[in-house]
From Swiss-Prot:
Predominant cellular place of this UniProt entry's protein: secreted
Tissue expression summary: Expressed by the venom gland.
Function text: Probable ion channel inhibitor.
Name of the protein this chain belongs to: U11-theraphotoxin-Hhn1a
Comment text on domains: The presence of a 'disulfide through disulfide knot' structurally defines this protein as a knottin.
GO molecular function ontology, one term from the record: sodium channel inhibitor activity
Presence of the UniProt keyword Zinc in the record: no
InterPro entries: Toxin_22
One GO cellular component term noted in the UniProt record for this chain: extracellular region
């Protein structure tokens, strides 16, 4: 019975000592993997940031091109309300009070001369 206890105690001590070494080794391996994972995450984050900046620059460029090409009209077209004191009707149009169908609007409209 003593030999069984001694054998069990010896196996237990060996398992604990070897297990502890494995635990320390496992901890070091985990730290290395964590550091590698962090560097990979930093790389992926930088790559994503670059792509987003490129996309933002492209969108801003398209917006500026669109605003350059689209000019606001500086005159008012036919049948559009205008101000009697400050008429901005296009050439060939005059700001007049409406006749017949538009009398109830109490506003001036651009009409052909």
């Amino acid at each position: 019975m003593n030999t069984v206890r001694v054998t069990f105690l010896l196996v237990f001590v060996l398992a604990v000592s070897l297990g502890q070494a494995d635990k320390d080794e496992n901890r070091m391996v985990m730290q290395e993997k964590t550091e590698q994972g962090k560097s990979y995450l930093d790389f992926a984050e930088n790559l994503l940031l670059q792509k987003l900046e490129e996309l933002e620059a492209k969108l801003l460029e398209e917006d500026s091109e669109e605003s350059r090409n689209s000019r606001q009209k500086r005159c008012i077209g036919e049948g559009v309300p205008c101000d009697e004191n400050d008429p901005r009707c296009c050439s060939g149009l005059v700001c007049l009070k409406p006749t017949l169908h538009g009398i109830w609007y109490k506003s001036y409209y651009c009409y052909k001369k």
